[in-house]
Amino acid sequence: MMNRKILLVVSASLLGWSLSQASITSVPTWNYSGGFYCYAPVFTAADQTVDLTGHQSSFGALGLSILTDTPTDPTLTINNSINNTSSFAWTEYIVSVAMNQSFTINSAGVVAPGGWTASITQPGAPVAGIYTGIIDYLGGTPVSIYPLLNSSLNFGYQVTFSGSTSYSLTQTANPVPEPGAWGFLTTGGLLMGGWTLARRRQVRLQRIA
């Protein structure tokens, strides 16, 4: 697994930091579901980052709890290094970020593979108390199937939030295959299904005979 980080060198004034800004004190719990597996997050208080490493075989989600010392505008940088253990190469990776307090997303990007871009849709009005934003990462060099070359997607983003000293964050990720791959996979599934039905019909005819 590639052990790279997105290093965001931004002045305190640019991030809107002030003497009254909160500090994140810990990321005490995490969970994962679906086709996503994550090792224990590594939180670094000095630079307010959390590093996430894991692997993904299909649509899945990761949840974090975040604690701060005051409720005033902390910023957390989230770095991900995810191995592709699915059955197809990724050329797009759509991340949904949801929190239980209002927040903004900034500085989204990909370290590796090269050539990827990121577009951000900021959270709108809450639904059932949950605010949700979207980051669409678009390739670039495809993320190949692990353990081939370029089989880890190393990406990151920042979230700035406020309103509490205890937060929940859910990162839901949907990897997208190369154009035409869905057709190939669907055709393969249809062919397999057709072969199975034909085989069952043949067995029934043999029994009748």
What are the functions of these language-model segments?
Residues 1-7:
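Bacterial N-terminal signal peptides that target proteins for export
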